[in-house]
Every structure is written in C-alpha cells, then in structure tokens.
C-alpha cells in the first residue's frame, strides 16, 4: 500500500433523498449536469449535480431490481436512458427537455444559485416539464441483465446477462422506438458482468464470471470474438476504456515533458485506447492492443504467457500493460477512468476508494539486438510510465460495500474550471459526491 498519498478525497455532498434499498450504479449524463442511479427498489432516480437533489424517479417499467443503466449519446432535444433489470428485460426511457442547454445547444452550468440551472430557471421545472416515457421493452435474455452500454454513435446497444450471453441491438431510429437484434454472442462460460464499447470504434469488451475479458467486432455483417484474455484469477467485475488523447502526468524529476508527451501520443496512435479491468482477485489491470506490425513479428513464440490476450480469430492481440498498485483487500467491483484527467479510481467490497495517477519516468532502453555491445549508440530513449495511488479513502460509505464509481464534471456553484467529482454508489442506498484535493 502507498505510504504517503499526495491527494485526499473530501465529501462534497450526498445526493438526496437516497434510496432506502441497495443502489448499484450511478451514470452521469454525457452532456447535462444530472446523473441516474439504479436501485434495488425497482426504480431509477435522476439527481441534479448543481444542487444534489432528486429531480425525477423513473418507475413502473421493471418487476425486479434495476441493476444497470446508460445514457444514449448524441441525442438532440431529449434524454434517452437504457435500463437493465434482474427481471431479464431492458427498458428504453425517453423524456423531452432542454434542461442545462443554451439555445445553440451548448452545455451550460448553473451559476447564480444552487436552484438555478445554466438557463437561469429553477431545476425543479425539470421534474415538472414532462414525465419519463417508457418507450420500449427489449426482451430476449433468460436471466438477470447485469450491464448495458451504448456504442459511440448511439446506434447500437449492448446488453449482457447472467444467462452467459451478450446481445447487440440496433436502434432503428424510425420514430416508433423499434430495435432490431443484430447479434447474440454466447462464448462466455459464466455470468457476463459488464459490457463496454470502445470510445470511437465499434469494438465491444465484455467481462465475466469465467475470469475472462473478451473483445468483439463485426466482420462482414457477423459479430464475433476477436480476442480473449485469461489474465485475471477471479471474476472480472467491470471494465472502462481510456479516453482519447490521454497523456500521463509528468513526474517532477522529468525535464522532458513535451518530448515525452509527443512520443507517447505517437505510440498510442498505433495501439489506440487501453482497457482497464478489475476483479475478484483484488487487482486492477490495464491492457493494450499490440499494433499490427508488432503482432506480425511476435506471432511465433507468444504462447505460455498468461497476460496475453490470444486472438481466437485473426484480428487482434492484446497484452497486459500494467498491474496497478495493489491497495484493495477484498473484491474490486468497479473502476472509472477519467476521460478528462486520465486519473483512474477503483472501489469494492472493502469500502475503499483508491485514486491512481500515471506518471512519466525516464530511463534508457536497449535496442532489440541483445548482441550489440554496450555503448551510447546502443541506447535509445523510450517513454516509460508508472502508476501510483495518490488518494486512499477508507470506509467511504461506513461499513457498506461500494458497488460503483464514476467521474463527472462538477456543476455546483463552487466548482473550478474543468473540475471533476467522483460519485460512489453503495449497498446502504447512498450516493456520495467527492472532490479530489491535491
């Protein structure tokens, strides 16, 4: 465990009123200062991040606990929310609103008071404008739905279940709320816990009780598995992708931040965003795709290494990039990778919140030819990074397990420019909003 964290987490507010039953997950809206929280009481609660109060309660669509939800991206003039339930169904909810948007469609934030949104009107109007509409029920899974995720374009919705299957649905966007099943994947050998879309590509990652992570792509109108990882030794609970254009922080001892950043971006442009995972084995791991040139060169002799994602087809090879500092003492249920700062947070059964930061290191690297004599001409510069735990908070929700964590843009009147908050969701029904002080 890190001896001297350099930052601290401070409670900003609880979201009120809370659910009286277990809450599973909180999903920040992609553009508005609101969040949706899933609860065992069969409802989804929508809260404001400007005043931390309840705006709406979505109910009546599911017969059992609502386990997961996700906002559809790139929707104009309304909010669209997908919900997944233990009743084996997926609900699509819609609501017309202009809350938090200026006339030109840009996102704005409340400034004048806790009860005003960016257009200067009371946020309570958001609740009174119009009720949520239960648009359609997607029926196909045979057991509890554990995760839902929209593709970057918003046209595809992935769902996964305890029935070991992953479904991909296409929103036909025909004005009649019609969805079409485009794929059903059943390669996992256990409960599928999480699905997460690549931030820009139509590539889907899934995590399972079978201890594996799998990658899926469409090939000639047919979705199939392109890679499978067997690096974790326990259930893989959650996945999150790195943001586009992320660059690690520069360590204080490094005087070459600019050149390192440029070299880093060049390297990442070849492999793309990385993938973070967390597990029952109490580890957080980060995976990266090997560029095609490297895959061709190392195709022979790559067996026997447990941290390699071995392709079952011909498409991709993924490998472990790093094992993060092992801070948690029990199962890790969720990770959240900030798309703005590159910070990564984890939560789990031990009640801890841990925040990690990636820092540049500088060290020489030898050329691949090991027979080359040791001299200055045989040494080439290469970027290296290390992850450190910069903040550790014990007992974030008292004695209760923390089920989920998410980053969101801070929206209350005391915010700083581009400041983010952490939102945690727990077994006691509470949702807490935290600030990171450095």
Swiss-Prot record:
Q: Which UniProt keywords apply?
A: Repeat, WD repeat
Short name of one Pfam family for this protein? Answer: WD40
**UniProt key word Repeat:** yes
- A cellular component term, taken from the record's GO annotations: cytosolic [4Fe-4S] assembly targeting complex
Keyword Ribosomal protein part of the UniProt annotation: no
Q: Share an example GO biological-process annotation for this protein.
A: iron-sulfur cluster assembly
Name where the WD repeats lie: 15-57, 61-103, 140-179, 187-226, 254-297, 327-366, 396-438
Looking up PROSITE patterns in the UniProt record yields:
WD_REPEATS_2, WD_REPEATS_REGION
Polar residues bias spans: 296-305
Task: Give the residue ranges for region: Disordered.
Answer: 290-311
Disulphide bonds annotated for this chain are none
Q: Which family does it belong to?
A: Belongs to the WD repeat CIA1 family.
PANTHER family, from UniProt?
A: CYTOSOLIC IRON-SULFUR PROTEIN ASSEMBLY PROTEIN CIAO1-RELATED, WD40 PROTEIN CIAO1
Task: Quote the function comment for this protein.
Answer: Essential component of the cytosolic iron-sulfur (Fe/S) protein assembly machinery. Required for the maturation of extramitochondrial Fe/S proteins.
Query: What name appears for this protein in its UniProt entry?
Result: Probable cytosolic iron-sulfur protein assembly protein 1
Organism, as annotated: Aspergillus oryzae (strain ATCC 42149 / RIB 40) (Yellow koji mold)
């Amino acid at each position: 465990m890190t001896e001297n964290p350099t930052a601290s987490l401070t409670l900003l507010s609880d979201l009120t009123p809370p659910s009286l039953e277990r809450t599973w997950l909180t999903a920040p809206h992609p553009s508005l200062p609101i969040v949706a929280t899933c609860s065992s009481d069969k409802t989804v609660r929508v809260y404001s991040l400007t005043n931390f109060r309840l705006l709406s309660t979505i109910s009546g669509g599911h017969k059992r606990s609502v386990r997961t939800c996700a906002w559809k991206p790139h929707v104009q003039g309304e909010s669209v929310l997908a919900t997944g339930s233990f009743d084996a169904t997926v609900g699509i909810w819609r609501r017309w609103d202009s809350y938090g948007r200026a006339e030109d469609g840009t996102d704005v934030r409340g400034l004048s008071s806790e009860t005003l949104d960016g257009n200067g009107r009371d946020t309570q109007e958001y609740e009174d404008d119009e009720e949520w509409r239960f648009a359609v029920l997607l029926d196909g899974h045979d057991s509890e739905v554990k995760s839902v995720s929209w593709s970057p374009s918003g046209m595809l919705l992935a769902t996964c279940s305890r029935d070991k299957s992953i479904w991909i649905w296409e929103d036909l966007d025909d004005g009649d709320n019609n969805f079409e099943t485009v794929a059903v994947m059943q390669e996992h050998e256990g409960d599928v816990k999480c699905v997460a879309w690549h931030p820009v590509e139509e590539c889907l990652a899934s995590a399972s009780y079978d201890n594996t992570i799998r990658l899926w792509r469409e090939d000639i109108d047919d979705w199939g598995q392109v890679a499978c990882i067997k690096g974790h030794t326990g259930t893989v609970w959650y996945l999150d992708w790195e943001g586009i254009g992320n660059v690690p922080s520069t360590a204080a001892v490094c005087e070459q931040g600019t050149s390192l950043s440029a070299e880093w971006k060049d390297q990442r442009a070849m492999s793309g965003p990385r993938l973070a995972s967390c597990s029952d084995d109490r580890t957080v791991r980060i995976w990266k795709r090997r560029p095609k040139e490297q895959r061709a060169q190392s195709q022979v002799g790559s067996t026997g290494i447990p941290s390699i994602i071995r392709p079952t087809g011909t498409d991709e090879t993924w490998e472990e990039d790093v094992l993060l500092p092992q801070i948690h003492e029990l199962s890790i249920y969720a990770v959240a990778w900030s798309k703005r700062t590159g910070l990564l947070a984890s939560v789990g059964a031990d009640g801890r919140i841990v925040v990690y930061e990636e820092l540049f290191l500088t060290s020489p690297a030898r050329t691949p030819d090991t027979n080359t004599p040791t001299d200055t001409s045989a040494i080439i510069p290469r970027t290296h990074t290390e992850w450190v735990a910069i903040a550790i908070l014990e007992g974030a929700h008292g004695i209760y397990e923390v089920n989920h964590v998410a980053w969101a843009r801070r929206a209350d009147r005391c915010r700083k420019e581009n400041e983010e908050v952490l939102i945690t969701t727990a077994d006691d029904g509470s949702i807490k909003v935290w600030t990171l002080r450095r």
